[in-house]
Design a protein with these regions (language model features):
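Phosphate- and divalent-cation-binding pockets in alpha/beta enzyme and binding domains
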Residues: 8-11, 43, 67, 107-108
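Conserved H-loop
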Residues: 19-23, 51
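Short acidic-hydrophobic, aromatic-tinged amphipathic segments that line or gate anion-handling sites
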Residues: 97-101
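Short amphipathic alpha-helix with an adjacent loop that forms part of the alpha/beta core around
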Residues: 105-115
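Short secondary-structure boundary segments
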Residues: 3, 29, 61, 79-82, ...
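Conserved Lys-Pro-Asp/Glu-containing loop-to-beta segment of HAD-superfamily phosphomonoesterases
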Residues: 34-65
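Acidic, Mg2+-coordinating phosphoryl-transfer loop and its flanking beta/alpha structural elements
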Residues: 57-96
Length: 116
């Protein structure tokens, strides 16, 4: 789920050679309401047949976190990306977790698996 248009997001994933890791891409053009409205997240979860409580949503912008929380997903703020400078301190976003680098995701997933 991205704020970019779907076709642009797909082009970026192709250019980065990571598109094979994504089952579904939904951009802002496929939903009536932009984030922080949870429409795009709910649409992706429905398409993937995943309950929001079983999902982790990573976001670099406060609107990502608000959207994740609005649909009951685990909201994980990330320090890489664009949002922190525009949205104030990441610690004020009310995310369930904050990741400093992509490598921190695996330990978080393992920790969350232990709780279930």
């Amino acid at each position: 789920v991205t704020g970019k248009y779907t076709n642009l997001a797909k082009l970026l994933l192709d250019k980065l050679k990571i598109s094979q890791y994504f089952d579904y891409v939904i951009g802002s053009d496929l939903c009536e309401h932009p984030k922080p409205h949870p429409c795009s997240l709910k649409k992706a979860l429905d398409k993937l047949n995943v309950d929001s409580k079983d999902s982790i949503y990573l976001g670099d912008h406060i609107n990502d976190i608000k959207a994740a929380l609005a649909c009951n997903a685990y909201a994980c703020a990330v320090r890489w990306g664009y949002g922190e400078g525009d949205c104030g301190k990441i610690e004020t976003w009310k995310a369930n977790a904050i990741l400093d680098k992509p490598q921190d995701l695996i330990p978080l997933i393992r920790k969350l698996e232990l709780k279930t």
